[in-house]
């Protein structure tokens, strides 16, 4: 081979290598250009097969990032470094879309670039240089079509977290960016592709813990996440919970359960639950009305069924939860809660964020299991709103209360009482307060079994504001109506209620300053709740009363409260009622139950002649001449007998000793003369009856003090009351006061006519229908007054008392107890020989005063009885018939007793704990409103 051929071959090889190097450089440049263009322009890369699938399903898969769908704003912010092309690829009909550019407000310009593989051409060029070198270059040219389109969008305000303030604009108007082939309608024509509307029903940041709701239950709502799922914007919702309307709007930060409610500048989240308090209610409906003050509602099965009516029909707006639940409430009868009041610009609740705005087109309330689940959510705002909403649901709805218990909601609420945030434990306590009120006693037991009482006490000791303290004490008041919880409250809550509420806010001071005026009573509603709770537990048993009496400062503060209220001319308040009823219960059996009670006991007076009006024979034995001569004389001619001074004390009385001191007696007298409330009158008369019971030193002093204060006429006036309980209490007090001889004379002169008027029969009181216990109490009082009191017996005959007594015996429609009590009075009257001739002249026969108790009616008594002329003893026995009223009837302990040491005492206690609603016409009661005090009295 000659040199020219070698040189030509070398030249060709060099040319080829140079061309290869240039081609490689060009290829790298093209790839770099492609990579750069792809990184800048590519948004969506859809293959024809995927595109056909998307068009067939009518949905579009959006990029998923960090557990949520990425919207336009997210794609603008995302990094492009993760988009790489790893070498040459088969770009089969790729579609590229540029990032939209906002040309002007409301418009976005998008550029679409499309490659046409069919139109790709290869261009080959051959170049020969002067030295004979041939250079061949092959270049592939692709056909690229660039299209620019403009679309109009509605700006969506963004929040600080990058998500829209109102998600409805995104969920309803979001247009996924696609290639132009896919941005056509079904007929091939141009048209935007609209993504599926969101289907979330609760806030986008509402996530449950991995274990469902943080706990599992053996029964009730399931704890698995499949049942309720995540409550974020991309939550997985079961079909039965999915909204039925296509125009359903995704919740926004303005919705009811938004995680971070907006509060004015300088405000705090605590302001969300600030309400202007009204008088405390048995149940509170702590909610605010949103959406133009229309109330919310749910179907009876907590369903979310689509309501009928046009979208403009206001009836489609959800009404209050209690509306037509279980068909328990008639249609169109709603129980409105007072609207929350704004305080210093704060928001009463999250509902008010949307006040004045139209409701969402397809909003649904969360179901009861969902609300209970929200109590375990990690955000405090969700917990507090769920608790407040649960309190609203339970208002006047026993079915919901029972369902909350069955769904294990009560343990969660009790656990929230220890939560550090006020809005959380306040809402939980409010829900427990409503749950604890009602006919279902199992709710109270459930709270007790969850250690609810100790939890309430812990919260009470930490509470420093009136609103929270009021709810806590109201809940304890509700719980105290159940017998099995009373001692638990005494053991755990007594000292906390006394030290944290009664003493600090009563105005009483442990070291009083004589020069200082009485302090004003603070937090009256809280004191009312606390006194009502202690009033209930004081009827439990002697052990409870002993602990209450010995609680340091309790009796002192109670007496101070009543004195202060009387001084303010407010003797008819509920606070006075609860305090006086509590003092009455603490005075029950006080002569027996106080420490060292034996030092106050007095011996029974000796009776010189046991044969008298109370002899075993109806007509008695012959009396001595001295006895008959002394019968008509006044036994208290000596003026010294009309005045009895209380023992002198070296130190002021404190604690339980105040229960039988002159100052407390004057309180009862003032209430008898000034108060118009039947319950207060009854309690005052009952307290006097208790203090005058038994043979003890202070009982004798108090009987005399009441006569000196001219209280006998005030008590006798109560016999004309229209309220049976007041009449019965006054009758019992007069009976005990009649033990004093001087009192007996005055009562016989002034009270016998009123006592006779209250007996059944005759025309004067034909409309009255007193119970058996009241009639027996009146008869026993009459017998006590006329015994050894001839003038009183004559007064009885003059007021047609004989006719009524005989009618009770012979009518055949009275109970055995009434017949026996009337027979005792008739026997006492016939025992006076001075009255026999006048009675015979009036047509009465001896047989009218002889009563065969064997023939008495036994319809209301099946037990054996004592066939004697002595009063029947029905010691500590309650009436079989419960009066149709809210208050607990005063028991008839000792209404017919043999010994003065055991009778004449009364204890005010609740007999039927199932009655929780007050009825009109009851003593001092009213229909419980959303702000009315709890009417649970003992």
Swiss-Prot record:
Where does tissue-level expression of this protein occur? Expressed in basal keratinocytes (at protein level).
State where the record puts the cross-link Glycyl lysine isopeptide (Lys-Gly) (interchain with G-Cter in SUMO2).
421, 517, 882
A Gene Ontology biological process annotation?
Answer: kidney development
Q: Subunit notes for this chain?
A: Belongs to a multiprotein cell-cell adhesion complex that also contains E-cadherin/CDH1, alpha-catenin/CTNNA1, beta-catenin/CTNNB1, and gamma-catenin/JUP. Binds to the C-terminal fragment of PSEN1 and mutually competes for CDH1. Interacts with ZBTB33. Interacts with GLIS2. Interacts with FER. Interacts with NANOS1 (via N-terminal region). Interacts (via N-terminus) with GNA12; the interaction regulates CDH1-mediated cell-cell adhesion. Interacts with GNA13.
Protein's UniProt name = Catenin delta-1
- Family that this chain belongs to: Belongs to the beta-catenin family.
**Highest taxon of source:** Eukaryota
Residues the record annotates as the site (Essential for interaction with cadherins) are: 401, 478
Give the sites modified to Phosphotyrosine.
112, 217, 221, 228, 257, 280, 291, 865, 904
Where is the segment annotated Necessary and sufficient for interaction with CCDC85B?
1-357
Please name the PANTHER family in this protein's record.
Answer: CATENIN DELTA-1 (PTHR10372:SF6), PLAKOPHILLIN-RELATED (PTHR10372)
Function, in words: Key regulator of cell-cell adhesion that associates with and regulates the cell adhesion properties of both C-, E- and N-cadherins, being critical for their surface stability. Promotes localization and retention of DSG3 at cell-cell junctions, via its interaction with DSG3. Beside cell-cell adhesion, regulates gene transcription through several transcription factors including ZBTB33/Kaiso2 and GLIS2, and the activity of Rho family GTPases and downstream cytoskeletal dynamics.
| Record-listed Phosphoserine modification sites | 4, 47, 125, 225, 230, 252, 268-269, 288, 300, 320, 346, 349, 352, 617, 713, 811, 847, 857, 859, 861, 864, 868, 879, 899, 920
Q: Which Pfam families does the UniProt record give? A: Arm
Primary site of residence: other
PTM: Phosphorylated by FER and other protein-tyrosine kinases. Phosphorylated at Ser-288 by PAK5. Dephosphorylated by PTPRJ.
Phosphothreonine: modified positions: 59, 304, 869, 906, 916
Species of origin: Mus musculus (Mouse)
- Gene field: Ctnnd1
Which spans does this entry mark as compositional bias, Polar residues? 892-908
Q: Where do the segments described as Disordered lie?
A: 855-938
Which GO molecular function annotation, any one, does this entry have? protein phosphatase binding
Q: Does the keyword Transcription apply?
A: yes
- Give its localization: Cell junction, Adherens junction; Cytoplasm; Nucleus; Cell membrane
Residues folding into a coiled coil are: 10-46
Positions modified as N-acetylmethionine? 1
GO CC, any one term: cell-cell junction
ARM repeat intervals: 358-395, 398-437, 441-475, 476-516, 534-573, 583-624, 653-693, 700-739, 740-780, 781-826
